[in-house]
Structures are given as structure tokens and as C-alpha cells.
């Protein structure tokens, strides 16, 4: 049986939650391998709607959830999320959730620095969620992070906090923000330890056992390829690598761990916050896409920017992300539009490009080259087979396949998990 990684192929918010939920019902284990609680999934199960930011989506299907070492974990946010879903009747405990003991912790000072920096940027804001993800990754790379395993060694925490505060309080003071007292942080960590440590273990060992037992593993990515810290629209990106290759390192498994990479893309484009967006629409069509698609962020509540499908961007995501099949979502949002446009290239300073350059100045200057297609008047909502789709809708999907150079293996036609057209089963490789 194949192990599957699911990643976003645009700027996030592509509908990964529904697709992951659909796949999780057929997996044995669901693994988070990067990011933090800065991205959200909305899952509808029966009459319950779950909003998850840190917990693996498979938990709502009764599957084992694993948070890998590549994730930065805010312990307060984790416990709050567990309490919230538990109040909805979902049992989450050490039997159903395991967390890598070498995962980095997000502390209150990380969020404080995140917000202070963003405020200091003024009009040049990156658009972070202010939840401390970036500063926590900085500490990890600088080898001063406090990790979950450190909670089991309280005698070492004081010295580690000294090093941490030497760095962060200097930054906070320079930004004119309030600094932190060591004792308050130490007391908080000591109080959290007995609540967090029961979930901790070297998850690489468990995942090795799961793999050798032939069980199905679903790797659940957060954010998307175009928010990757290396391959995205830098500096308007997240602080981790979001491509499928990260699934191995972020969970403690080797590169052979992933057999199939499924990329999620909307049938149009959206983006939250700042950064280049060549196909963004500022007219009534853009408003229509936002209203029909209910385009508001799960975590921030911010209205998403909307535009036409960018085949150049998604093709690039396919190549650098290792995507072998696309799950195309929200096709029904395009129902009734008389004309559709797909971006097939960019004009930048008089030159035509079939890629998004790395230079921020070139990205900001990119003007889309469009190909127009006839829309469809019929409804695609709730379609569960190709026969249910209007002919023009099928043509639109086929053209996306041609331009992105990857097959559409799954098509979503409504938020309902059963309104899905399966072309190829990702778990069959």
C-alpha cells in the first residue's frame, strides 16, 4: 500500500481539509510534518464542524495522529485545541495522539516578537499570523530552542531560558516592546510539563514500526508550495519548507517514506495577506469568487484575495513540490460564469516567462498572459462522476492538466466529503 503526502499547490486555503478528511478515512495514521498553528482546516463530520490548526485531521476519523519533529508546537494552543474538540465529543488523548519529543516549542515570547516585528514593518508587513511560528523556527536553527524533551529535565530549563531571554529580550527592547521575566516562563513550562509529556515519544520509531507493518500513512502538509520558505514568493512566505520532500525529514522517516504526492489546487486562485498575486481580480468577478467560495481564513478570519487560475504558478509548484496528481477543488464556484480565464504566462519588463522568477521586484512586476475559455451554465455542485459534469467544465479541467503537466486525480464539487470524483486512488500509488 502506498503512503501519501498531501500539500497545497497555491498559497494555502485550497481545501486540503476536506481532501485530507476524505483520505484519512482510508489511512491508518495521519502525520503533521511542518508548520504550526498558523494554518487551519475546517472538517465537517456529521452534524459537527471541527476547526483544527495543530491537530492532525485524521483524529476526527478515529485514526492515530502524529505531530512530527518538523512542527513547532505551542503547548497552550495544543491543549486549548484538544479541549475544544473534546467538548465536541472527540476523544483526544495519549492513546490517539503522539508528538515527537524533539519538536520545538513555541513560547509566549515568540508571539510577542512576531507581532512587534510586524508592527515595526509598517506598510511593508509580511502578513504573519503573529503566533510566533517564525521566531520559533529561528530558535531551532540557532540551536537555542526549547524542545518537548526538555520539559522532562526541569533542572536544565533555567539555563536554557537564560540563553533564550538574552537574545529575545534584547530584540524586544529594541523594538520598544515589553520584555519577559524568566521565572514566569519557567513556572509556565513546569506547569505544562505533566500535561504535554504523556503525548511525547520518539515518533520516528513508531512510524518505522507502522511502515514495516504495511499500514497506510497520510502525511498532512500545512500552507502550500508558494508559501515555502525557499520556493515560495519570498519574503511573503511561511517559515518552513512546505514541499512534499519535507514529509520525510519532518517526521523522522527516510526519503522513501512517501509513495504518492497529491497537490491540492482550487479551480481559481486565492491568497491571504500581502505578497505578489499576478492574477488577482479587483472587479465584480473577484468579489463574486470570494462570496461564492466563502473566502475567509480559518485562523485569521481575513478575507482572501481572489483571482483566475494561474497555471504557471501551479506548474511550478508541481515541479518543485514533487506533485504527481492534482486534487482540484471548488469547481462549483465557477458555475454560471460566461467566460473563464487561465494564466499561461507572465509579461515582465517586456519579456514572457513560463515561471515565476525568484526576484521580488520581478514578481511584483509580473502581468498575466491569459487564455480565455467558455464557461458553463449547468451546475457542477454535488457531481460525483464525470457524466454529471457539463462538457465545458470537463474541457476546463483537461486544459488545466495540459498546462500544469500533471493529471487531475481527484475533483471536489462541494464542501461535502462525498461530493468527490475519484480518477485515481492515491493510496494505490
Curated annotation (Swiss-Prot):
**EC annotation from Swiss-Prot or TrEMBL:** 6.3.4.4
Q: Where is the active site?
A: 13, 41
Q: Where does Mg(2+) bind?
A: 13, 40
The cofactor note from the UniProt entry for this protein is: Binds 1 Mg(2+) ion per subunit.
Its chief place of residence is cytoplasm
Q: Which UniProt keywords apply?
A: Cytoplasm, GTP-binding, Ligase, Magnesium, Metal-binding, Nucleotide-binding, Purine biosynthesis
- Please write the reaction equations for the catalytic activity of this protein: IMP + L-aspartate + GTP = N(6)-(1,2-dicarboxyethyl)-AMP + GDP + phosphate + 2 H(+)
User: What pathway is this protein a component of?
Assistant: Purine metabolism; AMP biosynthesis via de novo pathway; AMP from IMP: step 1/2
Molecular-function annotations in GO:
adenylosuccinate synthase activity; GTP binding; magnesium ion binding
Q: Which residues bind substrate?
A: 298-304
The entry describes its oligomerization and partners as: Homodimer.
Q: Name it.
A: Adenylosuccinate synthetase
Q: Which organism is it from?
A: Granulibacter bethesdensis (strain ATCC BAA-1260 / CGDNIH1)
Amino acid at each position: 500500500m502506498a503512503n501519501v503526502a498531501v500539500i497545497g499547490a497555491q498559497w494555502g486555503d485550497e481545501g486540503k481539509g476536506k481532501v485530507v478528511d476524505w483520505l484519512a478515512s482510508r489511512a491508518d495514521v495521519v502525520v503533521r510534518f511542518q508548520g504550526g498553528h498558523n494554518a487551519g482546516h475546517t472538517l465537517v463530520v456529521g452534524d459537527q464542524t471541527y476547526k483544527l490548526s495543530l491537530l492532525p485531521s485524521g483524529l476526527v476519523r478515529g485514526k492515530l495522529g502524529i505531530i512530527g519533529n518538523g512542527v513547532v508546537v505551542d503547548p497552550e494552543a495544543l491543549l486549548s485545541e484538544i479541549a475544544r474538540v473534546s467538548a465536541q465529543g472527540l476523544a483526544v488523548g495519549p492513546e490517539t495522539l503522539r508528538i515527537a519529543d524533539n519538536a520545538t516549542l513555541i513560547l509566549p515570547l515568540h508571539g510577542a516578537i512576531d507581532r512587534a516585528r510586524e508592527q515595526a514593518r509598517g506598510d511593508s508587513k509580511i502578513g504573519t499570523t503573529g503566533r510566533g511560528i517564525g521566531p520559533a523556527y529561528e530558535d531551532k536553527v540557532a540551536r537555542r530552542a526549547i524542545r518537548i524533551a526538555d520539559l522532562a529535565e526541569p533542572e536544565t530549563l533555567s539555563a536554557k531560558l537564560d540563553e533564550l531571554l538574552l537574545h529575545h529580550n534584547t530584540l524586544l527592547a529594541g523594538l520598544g516592546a515589553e520584555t519577559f521575566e524568566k521565572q514566569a516562563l519557567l513556572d509556565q513550562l513546569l506547569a505544562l510539563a505533566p500535561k504535554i509529556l504523556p503525548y511525547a515519544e520518539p515518533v520516528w520509531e513508531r512510524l518505522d514500526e507502522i511502515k514495516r507493518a504495511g499500514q497506510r500513512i497520510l502525511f498532512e502538509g500545512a500552507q502550500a508550495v508558494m508559501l515555502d520558505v525557499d520556493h515560495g514568493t519570498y519574503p511573503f512566505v511561511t517559515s518552513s519548507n512546505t514541499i512534499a520532500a519535507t514529509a520525510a525529514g519532518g517526521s523522522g522517516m527516510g526519503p522513501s517514506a512517501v509513495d504518492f504526492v497529491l497537490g491540492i489546487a482550487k479551480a481559481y486562485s486565492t491568497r491571504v495577506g500581502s505578497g505578489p498575486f499576478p492574477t488577482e481580480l479587483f472587479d465584480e468577478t473577484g468579489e463574486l469568487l470570494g462570496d461564492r467560495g466563502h473566502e475567509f481564513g480559518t485562523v485569521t478570519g481575513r478575507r482572501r484575495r481572489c483571482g483566475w487560475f494561474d497555471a504557471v504558478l501551479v506548474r511550478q509548484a508541481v515541479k518543485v513540490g514533487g506533485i504527481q496528481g492534482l486534487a482540484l477543488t471548488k469547481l462549483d464556484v465557477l458555475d454560471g460564469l460566461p467566460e473563464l480565464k487561465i494564466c499561461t504566462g507572465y509579461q515582465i519588463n517586456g519579456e514572457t516567462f513560463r515561471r515565476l522568477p525568484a526576484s521580488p521586484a520581478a514578481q511584483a512586476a509580473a502581468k498575466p498572459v491569459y487564455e480565455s475559455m467558455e464557461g458553463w451554465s449547468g451546475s457542477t455542485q454535488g457531481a460525483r462522476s464525470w457524466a454529471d459534469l457539463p462538457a465545458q467544465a470537463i474541457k476546463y479541467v483537461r486544459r488545466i492538466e495540459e498546462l500544469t503537466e500533471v493529471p487531475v486525480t481527484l475533483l471536489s464539487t462541494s464542501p461535502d466529503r462525498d461530493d468527490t470524483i475519484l480518477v485515481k486512488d492515491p493510496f494505490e500509488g
